[in-house]
């Protein structure tokens, strides 16, 4: 199969939405029956984002095969059916590490290792390898044109376009077209300068996607086309909208997919966007509203919980409920008390690392249990629910996780020292293992117990969900906690690790060691989140006995 390539770059400022624009184009092409994949090339020197601060970089998205990747891959999977893998995201750090490893092995036969050709060749090889078997590969280069860090990537895609030829490669550039209220018009000069910068490194964009708070007027589109050397029909206006899921329709209405198909000589049927129309309809026509409290430690940057935020919205669509997320700093629960949790229709405690705010999360789980507020715990959110139950119901005073207190009398959560990964390989860890890339990662099989809420929600005896953790329930103390009434509703493939717990004495109290948010999509939702938001709606309507 011959693969065609669309290279996506950004200019003027960062955070323009390259990932959303690229994913929207991918969704339209997929709706035309094409097999589409996407890639994100990140210019930073970290080998992967696994150890980067969520408040700087946003969430780490985990793929089925266990890669810790950029959050844009989450957008990709929410917009298209293709599942991302470790091949779909790589960093400058990863490329340099590979090249240096080969140099140490002697693979380059004594050559002087340089950015060109060794680094650029390594980038090109990874792009080609990661796109095999698809009609179209959309490759997003992180950062902004002009950044020093992105230059090797820009040079690599320039070379690739030359090698592939115009019939198999094209460039799509995102820019900002700001509106100046004082002048009463949009300004095209930043776009012109951005394209000039791109031209200086040998790349002529074929399509310009212009971000603005309004549609770009026809005269300005003509001006941009003239000065940036692109066709007028290739100047696409991407105005601000109230939902990212409206972007596919917006850019399709301007013929973006037709430009791509014409360039590549692809004869494909018109895009069927009926599924996206249904999503937009559900979003615009809720029948009720719920407020869900997310108790976390990274709340100053909502992107730290991007997939959780989106999964809650998707669940709202499936229940025809408008979901308002109230972010609660877990440290506020510690200092101000549980009063900050009052008035919430449901409580969610997401994943996290470190002991800052941990007692606040434990108190949030206690508040939800005692006040019959629907509770969903994810990863650390499951562990704090277990710790709280052990302390306050099972009589295990001072119970804790060894992550936070190595000397606790009741270490109900401890480091996983051995497990079987998704490929059947035995993994081992110790307290002195590196932090990067050493967690239990990727999609794992989970057995669901009969007669549990988890089994009812999923409708299956076995499921596959993605993991990212290094601590687990201590099986030595499990019997005492279960005897006190907490139900273990999900177990790992070898039935040695606890994957889900629930409280049968509570209307809706479910927690999972895995990350269900990574597999939620706007078109399909996710059963765990759908059940949680449904319970929030029931609680809001006063249907739960308190």
Swiss-Prot record:
Highest taxon in the source lineage: Bacteria
Entry's Gene Ontology molecular function annotations: ATP binding; CTP synthase activity; glutaminase activity; identical protein binding; metal ion binding
Region (Amidoligase domain): 1-266
InterPro entries named in the record: Class_I_gatase-like (IPR029062), CTP_synthase (IPR004468), CTP_synthase_N (IPR017456), GATASE (IPR017926), GATase1_CTP_Synthase (IPR033828), P-loop_NTPase (IPR027417)
One Gene Ontology term from the biological process aspect of the record: 'de novo' CTP biosynthetic process
Annotated binding of Mg(2+), by residue: 72, 140
EC number(s) from the headed UniProt entry: 6.3.4.2
Residues at which L-glutamine binds: 352, 380-383, 403, 470
Positions contributing to CTP binding: 14, 147-149, 187-192, 223
PROSITE patterns on file: GATASE_TYPE_1
Catalytic center residues: 379 (nucleophile), 515, 517
Protein keywords: ATP-binding, Glutamine amidotransferase, Ligase, Magnesium, Metal-binding, Nucleotide-binding, Pyrimidine biosynthesis
Ubl conjugation among keywords: no
Record field: catalytic activity: UTP + L-glutamine + ATP + H2O = CTP + L-glutamate + ADP + phosphate + 2 H(+); L-glutamine + H2O = L-glutamate + NH4(+); UTP + NH4(+) + ATP = CTP + ADP + phosphate + 2 H(+)
Residues annotated as binding UTP: 14, 187-192, 223
Subunit structure: Homotetramer.
Family, per entry: Belongs to the CTP synthase family.
NCBIfam families according to UniProt: PRK05380.1, PyrG
Function in brief: Catalyzes the ATP-dependent amination of UTP to CTP with either L-glutamine or ammonia as the source of nitrogen. Regulates intracellular CTP levels through interactions with the four ribonucleotide triphosphates.
Protein name per its UniProtKB record: CTP synthase
Species of the source: Vibrio campbellii (strain ATCC BAA-1116)
């Amino acid at each position: 199969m011959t693969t065609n390539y669309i290279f996506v770059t950004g200019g003027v400022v960062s955070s323009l939405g390259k990932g959303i624009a690229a994913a929207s184009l991918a969704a339209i092409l997929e709706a035309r029956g094409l097999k589409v994949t996407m890639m994100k090339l990140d210019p930073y020197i970290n080998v992967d984002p696994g150890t980067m601060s969520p408040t700087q970089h946003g969430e780490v998205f985990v793929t089925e095969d266990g890669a810790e990747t950029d959050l844009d891959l989450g957008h990709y999977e929410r917009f298209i059916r293709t599942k991302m893998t470790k091949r779909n995201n790589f960093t400058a750090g990863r490329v340099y590490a590979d090249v240096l490893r080969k140099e140490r092995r002697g693979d380059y036969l004594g050559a002087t290792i340089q950015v060109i050709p060794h680094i650029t060749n390594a980038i090109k090889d990874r792009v080609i390898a990661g796109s095999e078997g698809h009609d179209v590969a959309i490759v997003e280069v992180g950062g902004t044109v002009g950044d020093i860090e992105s230059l090797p990537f820009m040079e690599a895609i320039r070379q690739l376009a030359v090698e592939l030829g115009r019939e198999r490669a094209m460039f799509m550039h995102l820019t900002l077209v700001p509106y100046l209220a004082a002048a009463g018009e949009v300004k095209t000069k930043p776009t012109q300068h951005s394209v000039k910068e791109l031209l200086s490194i040998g790349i002529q964009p074929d399509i310009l996607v212009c971000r603005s708070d309004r549609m770009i007027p026809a005269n300005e589109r003509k001006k941009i086309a003239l000065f940036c050397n692109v066709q007028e029909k290739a100047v696409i206006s991407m105005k601000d909208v109230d939902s990212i899921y409206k972007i596919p329709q917006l850019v399709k209405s301007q013929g973006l997919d037709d430009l791509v198909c014409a360039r590549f000589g692809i004869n494909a049927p018109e895009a069927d966007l009926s599924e996206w129309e249904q999503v937009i309809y559900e979003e615009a026509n809720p029948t009720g509203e719920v407020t869900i409290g997310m108790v976390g430690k990274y709340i100053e940057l909502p992107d730290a919980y991007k997939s959780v935020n989106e999964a809650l919205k998707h669940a709202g669509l499936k229940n025809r409920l408008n979901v308002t997320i109230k972010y609660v700093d877990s440290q506020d629960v510690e200092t101000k008390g549980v009063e900050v949790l009052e008035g919430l229709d449901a409580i969610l405690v997401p994943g996290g690392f470190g002991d800052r705010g941990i007692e606040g999360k434990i108190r949030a789980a206690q508040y939800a249990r005692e006040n019959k507020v629907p509770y969903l715990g994810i990863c650390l959110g499951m562990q704090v629910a277990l710790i709280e139950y052990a302390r306050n119901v099972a009589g295990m005073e001072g119970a804790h996780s060894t992550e936070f207190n190595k000397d606790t009398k009741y270490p109900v959560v401890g480091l996983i020292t051995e497990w079987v990964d998704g490929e059947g390989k035995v993994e081992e860890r110790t307290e002195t293992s590196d932090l990067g890339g050493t967690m239990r990662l990727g999609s794992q099989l989970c057995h669901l117990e009969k007669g549990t809420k988890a089994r009812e929600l999923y409708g299956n005896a076995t499921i596959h969900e993605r993991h990212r953790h290094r601590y687990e329930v201590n099986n030595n103390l499990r019997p005492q906690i279960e005897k006190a009434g907490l139900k273990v509703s999900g177990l790992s493939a070898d039935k040695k690790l606890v994957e889900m717990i629930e409280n049968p004495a509570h209307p809706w109290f479910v927690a999972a060691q895995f990350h269900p948010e990574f597999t939620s999509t706007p078109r399909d939702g996710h059963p765990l989140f759908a059940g949680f938001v449904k319970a929030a709606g029931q609680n809001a309507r006063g249907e739960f006995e308190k």
